[in-house]
Design a protein with these regions (language model features):
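Terminal substrate-recognition subdomain of acyl/acetyltransferases
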Residues: 1-74, 179-246
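A conserved beta-strand-loop-helix scaffold within acyl/acetyltransferase catalytic domains
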Residues: 40, 68-154, 185, 245-246
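Generic alpha-helical secondary structure signal
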Residues: 61, 99, 164-167, 172, ...
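Acyl-donor binding region in acyl/amide transferases
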Residues: 18-25, 29-31, 117-118, 129-132, ...
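A short linear-motif detector with a strong N-terminal bias
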Residues: 19-21, 29, 56-58, 100-102, ...
Length: 246
Protein backbone atom coordinates (compact mmCIF):
# COMPACT_ATOMS: atom_id res chain seq x y z
CA UNK A 1 0.00 0.00 0.00
CA UNK A 2 1.11 3.53 -0.85
CA UNK A 3 -0.89 6.50 0.45
CA UNK A 4 -1.05 9.85 -1.34
CA UNK A 5 -2.28 13.10 0.20
CA UNK A 6 -3.26 16.25 -1.69
CA UNK A 7 -2.89 19.21 0.66
CA UNK A 8 -4.98 21.58 -1.42
CA UNK A 9 -6.06 24.22 1.08
CA UNK A 10 -6.85 24.99 4.72
CA UNK A 11 -7.14 27.63 7.44
CA UNK A 12 -5.40 27.90 10.81
CA UNK A 13 -5.98 31.48 12.00
CA UNK A 14 -9.57 32.16 13.10
CA UNK A 15 -10.57 28.54 12.53
CA UNK A 16 -8.86 25.23 11.91
CA UNK A 17 -9.63 22.98 8.94
CA UNK A 18 -7.79 21.33 6.06
CA UNK A 19 -9.04 20.06 2.73
CA UNK A 20 -6.89 17.02 2.00
CA UNK A 21 -8.17 14.39 -0.46
CA UNK A 22 -6.60 11.01 0.27
CA UNK A 23 -5.74 8.35 -2.31
CA UNK A 24 -3.86 5.07 -2.26
CA UNK A 25 -2.30 2.40 -4.43
CA UNK A 26 -2.81 -1.25 -3.47
CA UNK A 27 -1.42 -4.57 -4.54
CA UNK A 28 -4.01 -7.06 -5.80
CA UNK A 29 -3.59 -9.10 -2.63
CA UNK A 30 -4.65 -6.02 -0.61
CA UNK A 31 -7.89 -5.21 -2.46
CA UNK A 32 -10.29 -6.89 -0.04
CA UNK A 33 -8.55 -5.42 2.98
CA UNK A 34 -8.63 -1.98 1.35
CA UNK A 35 -12.39 -2.15 0.79
CA UNK A 36 -12.92 -3.23 4.39
CA UNK A 37 -11.08 -0.09 5.48
CA UNK A 38 -13.10 2.47 3.56
CA UNK A 39 -11.30 2.52 0.20
CA UNK A 40 -12.94 2.15 -3.22
CA UNK A 41 -11.39 2.02 -6.72
CA UNK A 42 -11.33 5.41 -8.47
CA UNK A 43 -13.25 4.97 -11.73
CA UNK A 44 -11.73 7.98 -13.46
CA UNK A 45 -8.17 7.99 -12.09
CA UNK A 46 -6.92 4.40 -12.05
CA UNK A 47 -5.08 2.75 -10.41
CA UNK A 48 -5.91 5.05 -7.48
CA UNK A 49 -8.34 4.14 -4.70
CA UNK A 50 -10.10 6.90 -2.75
CA UNK A 51 -11.14 7.33 0.86
CA UNK A 52 -14.61 8.72 1.67
CA UNK A 53 -17.82 8.20 3.64
CA UNK A 54 -18.48 4.96 1.79
CA UNK A 55 -21.80 3.10 2.10
CA UNK A 56 -22.22 -0.65 1.85
CA UNK A 57 -24.68 -3.43 2.73
CA UNK A 58 -24.08 -6.78 4.40
CA UNK A 59 -25.50 -9.22 1.86
CA UNK A 60 -26.15 -11.95 4.43
CA UNK A 61 -28.94 -9.80 5.87
CA UNK A 62 -30.63 -9.62 2.48
CA UNK A 63 -30.95 -13.40 2.44
CA UNK A 64 -32.28 -13.51 6.00
CA UNK A 65 -35.08 -11.03 5.40
CA UNK A 66 -38.35 -11.33 3.51
CA UNK A 67 -37.85 -10.70 -0.19
CA UNK A 68 -38.70 -7.16 -1.25
CA UNK A 69 -41.99 -6.96 -3.17
CA UNK A 70 -41.56 -5.45 -6.62
CA UNK A 71 -44.61 -4.40 -8.71
CA UNK A 72 -45.43 -6.96 -11.41
CA UNK A 73 -45.20 -4.29 -14.10
CA UNK A 74 -41.46 -3.88 -13.37
CA UNK A 75 -38.92 -6.34 -14.74
CA UNK A 76 -35.12 -6.56 -14.77
CA UNK A 77 -32.52 -7.99 -17.11
CA UNK A 78 -28.80 -8.51 -16.47
CA UNK A 79 -26.53 -7.54 -19.38
CA UNK A 80 -22.98 -8.89 -19.46
CA UNK A 81 -20.25 -8.20 -22.03
CA UNK A 82 -21.96 -5.00 -23.14
CA UNK A 83 -21.36 -4.24 -26.82
CA UNK A 84 -23.15 -0.90 -27.23
CA UNK A 85 -24.48 1.94 -25.09
CA UNK A 86 -26.95 3.12 -27.71
CA UNK A 87 -29.99 1.73 -25.85
CA UNK A 88 -29.14 3.85 -22.80
CA UNK A 89 -28.24 7.17 -24.39
CA UNK A 90 -31.74 8.70 -24.39
CA UNK A 91 -32.33 7.59 -20.80
CA UNK A 92 -28.99 9.13 -19.82
CA UNK A 93 -29.79 12.45 -21.50
CA UNK A 94 -33.21 12.62 -19.86
CA UNK A 95 -31.72 11.73 -16.48
CA UNK A 96 -29.08 14.50 -16.68
CA UNK A 97 -31.76 17.00 -17.70
CA UNK A 98 -34.14 16.06 -14.88
CA UNK A 99 -31.35 16.20 -12.28
CA UNK A 100 -30.02 19.53 -13.55
CA UNK A 101 -26.59 18.05 -14.25
CA UNK A 102 -24.18 19.08 -16.99
CA UNK A 103 -25.65 17.48 -20.10
CA UNK A 104 -22.19 17.14 -21.65
CA UNK A 105 -21.31 14.27 -19.30
CA UNK A 106 -20.46 11.22 -21.35
CA UNK A 107 -21.89 7.82 -20.48
CA UNK A 108 -18.86 6.25 -22.16
CA UNK A 109 -16.63 7.28 -19.24
CA UNK A 110 -18.31 4.72 -17.00
CA UNK A 111 -17.06 1.95 -19.27
CA UNK A 112 -13.56 3.17 -20.10
CA UNK A 113 -12.08 1.29 -17.14
CA UNK A 114 -12.47 -2.50 -16.92
CA UNK A 115 -15.66 -2.83 -19.02
CA UNK A 116 -15.35 -6.62 -18.81
CA UNK A 117 -15.76 -6.37 -15.02
CA UNK A 118 -19.05 -4.48 -15.20
CA UNK A 119 -22.66 -5.41 -15.80
CA UNK A 120 -25.77 -3.40 -16.58
CA UNK A 121 -29.12 -3.97 -14.92
CA UNK A 122 -31.84 -2.97 -17.36
CA UNK A 123 -35.15 -1.90 -15.81
CA UNK A 124 -38.41 -2.30 -17.73
CA UNK A 125 -41.85 -0.87 -17.03
CA UNK A 126 -44.52 -2.73 -19.00
CA UNK A 127 -41.75 -4.05 -21.30
CA UNK A 128 -40.38 -0.56 -22.00
CA UNK A 129 -36.75 0.13 -21.06
CA UNK A 130 -36.94 3.11 -18.70
CA UNK A 131 -33.86 2.81 -16.48
CA UNK A 132 -30.47 1.17 -16.09
CA UNK A 133 -27.86 0.62 -13.40
CA UNK A 134 -24.13 0.06 -13.89
CA UNK A 135 -22.39 -2.27 -11.43
CA UNK A 136 -18.70 -3.04 -11.07
CA UNK A 137 -18.23 -6.65 -9.94
CA UNK A 138 -14.47 -6.85 -9.38
CA UNK A 139 -12.45 -6.45 -7.25
CA UNK A 140 -15.59 -5.74 -5.18
CA UNK A 141 -19.21 -5.11 -6.23
CA UNK A 142 -19.91 -1.38 -6.48
CA UNK A 143 -23.12 0.17 -7.78
CA UNK A 144 -21.70 3.00 -9.87
CA UNK A 145 -24.65 4.71 -11.53
CA UNK A 146 -28.43 4.50 -11.72
CA UNK A 147 -30.30 6.53 -14.34
CA UNK A 148 -33.94 6.64 -15.33
CA UNK A 149 -36.40 8.78 -17.27
CA UNK A 150 -38.55 9.87 -14.29
CA UNK A 151 -41.55 8.95 -16.45
CA UNK A 152 -43.44 7.90 -13.29
CA UNK A 153 -41.73 9.10 -10.09
CA UNK A 154 -44.28 7.33 -7.88
CA UNK A 155 -42.88 3.98 -9.03
CA UNK A 156 -39.67 4.61 -7.02
CA UNK A 157 -37.69 2.61 -9.56
CA UNK A 158 -34.40 3.43 -7.86
CA UNK A 159 -35.52 1.77 -4.62
CA UNK A 160 -36.79 -1.35 -6.41
CA UNK A 161 -33.62 -1.57 -8.50
CA UNK A 162 -31.42 -1.32 -5.40
CA UNK A 163 -33.30 -4.19 -3.75
CA UNK A 164 -32.98 -6.23 -6.94
CA UNK A 165 -29.22 -5.61 -7.04
CA UNK A 166 -28.77 -6.64 -3.42
CA UNK A 167 -30.80 -9.81 -3.84
CA UNK A 168 -29.01 -10.66 -7.09
CA UNK A 169 -25.51 -10.19 -5.63
CA UNK A 170 -26.47 -12.11 -2.49
CA UNK A 171 -27.77 -15.01 -4.60
CA UNK A 172 -24.38 -15.39 -6.30
CA UNK A 173 -22.88 -16.51 -3.01
CA UNK A 174 -19.43 -15.05 -3.69
CA UNK A 175 -19.67 -11.57 -2.15
CA UNK A 176 -20.10 -10.47 1.46
CA UNK A 177 -20.95 -6.82 0.78
CA UNK A 178 -22.38 -4.55 -1.89
CA UNK A 179 -21.04 -0.98 -2.09
CA UNK A 180 -22.97 2.05 -3.34
CA UNK A 181 -20.24 4.73 -3.33
CA UNK A 182 -20.01 7.63 -0.84
CA UNK A 183 -22.93 9.04 1.14
CA UNK A 184 -23.00 12.83 1.28
CA UNK A 185 -25.76 15.46 1.45
CA UNK A 186 -29.54 15.02 1.63
CA UNK A 187 -29.62 13.25 -1.69
CA UNK A 188 -27.83 10.23 -0.17
CA UNK A 189 -29.99 9.73 2.92
CA UNK A 190 -32.02 7.12 1.00
CA UNK A 191 -29.01 4.80 1.07
CA UNK A 192 -29.64 4.08 4.75
CA UNK A 193 -33.05 2.46 4.07
CA UNK A 194 -31.79 -0.96 3.08
CA UNK A 195 -30.99 -4.06 5.16
CA UNK A 196 -27.38 -4.51 6.23
CA UNK A 197 -26.63 -0.77 5.94
CA UNK A 198 -23.19 0.43 7.07
CA UNK A 199 -21.21 3.60 6.46
CA UNK A 200 -17.49 4.24 6.90
CA UNK A 201 -16.84 6.98 9.48
CA UNK A 202 -13.09 7.02 8.92
CA UNK A 203 -12.25 4.50 11.63
CA UNK A 204 -14.83 1.74 11.36
CA UNK A 205 -18.10 0.70 9.73
CA UNK A 206 -21.13 2.06 11.58
CA UNK A 207 -24.79 0.98 11.38
CA UNK A 208 -25.99 4.15 13.12
CA UNK A 209 -28.63 5.43 10.70
CA UNK A 210 -29.39 8.50 12.82
CA UNK A 211 -25.75 9.60 12.82
CA UNK A 212 -25.47 9.02 9.08
CA UNK A 213 -28.57 11.11 8.39
CA UNK A 214 -27.30 13.89 10.67
CA UNK A 215 -23.99 14.00 8.81
CA UNK A 216 -25.78 14.16 5.45
CA UNK A 217 -27.95 17.03 6.68
CA UNK A 218 -24.84 18.89 7.87
CA UNK A 219 -23.31 18.43 4.41
CA UNK A 220 -26.28 20.09 2.71
CA UNK A 221 -26.56 22.95 5.21
CA UNK A 222 -22.89 23.90 4.97
CA UNK A 223 -22.29 27.16 3.09
CA UNK A 224 -18.99 28.47 4.43
CA UNK A 225 -16.12 26.03 5.16
CA UNK A 226 -15.49 28.03 8.33
CA UNK A 227 -18.84 26.76 9.58
CA UNK A 228 -17.64 23.18 9.56
CA UNK A 229 -19.10 21.26 12.48
CA UNK A 230 -17.00 20.84 15.61
CA UNK A 231 -18.46 17.36 16.07
CA UNK A 232 -15.71 14.84 16.67
CA UNK A 233 -16.51 11.27 15.70
CA UNK A 234 -13.60 9.96 17.78
CA UNK A 235 -14.70 9.55 21.41
CA UNK A 236 -12.11 10.24 24.10
CA UNK A 237 -12.08 6.60 25.16
CA UNK A 238 -11.91 5.14 21.64
CA UNK A 239 -10.13 1.78 21.46
CA UNK A 240 -7.51 2.44 18.79
CA UNK A 241 -6.45 -1.20 18.88
CA UNK A 242 -9.53 -1.91 16.72
CA UNK A 243 -7.98 -0.03 13.81
CA UNK A 244 -6.50 -2.36 11.20
CA UNK A 245 -2.71 -2.44 11.09
CA UNK A 246 -1.11 -2.71 7.66
Amino acid sequence: MKILFQHLCGRITRTDWQYTPVYALFEKSEFEKAANNGWLPHEYDPPLWFQARQVRYRLAECLQRKKHKIPKRIDFQIIENLKSLKAYEEIWKEYLKKKGFDEDQSLDRLFELDPEKKIVVEVYDYDELVAFSVIRLEPIPVSLQFAWTYHNPKLSLGIHCQYFELEYLASLGVYTHSYVCPGYENTCIWKSRFPGFEFWNGMEWSSDRNLYERLCLIDSSLVDPDDLSNDDLIPINYDFSKITSW
